[in-house]
């Protein structure tokens, strides 16, 4: 729990700094960097113990921030909303190996989520490994992640 608290503090500090980005506050790339970094840190925290776990958090945060910044630079709010809803649907209902697609008709951006593996982690939570692929302005980006059901069912 201490590690999760540290991650949340880092994410809050990063969002506060990013909000100082000038007029208009946080931009798409900044949002992608922040969310990618936080997600990467959370993913990295699932591996190792002690100092090894801290290394996992650091590496996950760095890789997530880089990839999230690249993807976020091209995604608009509508893209993110559609992609998030599609991700939830895919992780809840799609069989492993199947693509659940999304498309923004306003700008032509699209992507898909592919659940790859369902498992229970060391604390008994149900989890899924997945691949998220987005095509923004004709350029494809892939990200890999794990999502675990929380005790409240979310």
Swiss-Prot record:
Keywords: Cell outer membrane, Lipoprotein, Membrane, Palmitate, Signal. A lipid is attached at residue 20 (N-palmitoyl cysteine). Coiled coil: none annotated. Pfam families: 17kDa_Anti_2, Rick_17kDa_Anti. Residues 1-19 form the signal peptide. It is found in: Cell outer membrane. It is a lipid-anchor. One of its GO terms (cellular component) is cell outer membrane. A lipid is attached at residue 20 (S-diacylglycerol cysteine). Belongs to the rickettsiale 17 kDa surface antigen family. This is 17 kDa surface antigen. It comes from Rickettsia amblyommatis. The lineage of its organism: Bacteria, Pseudomonadati, Pseudomonadota, Alphaproteobacteria, Rickettsiales. The gene is omp.
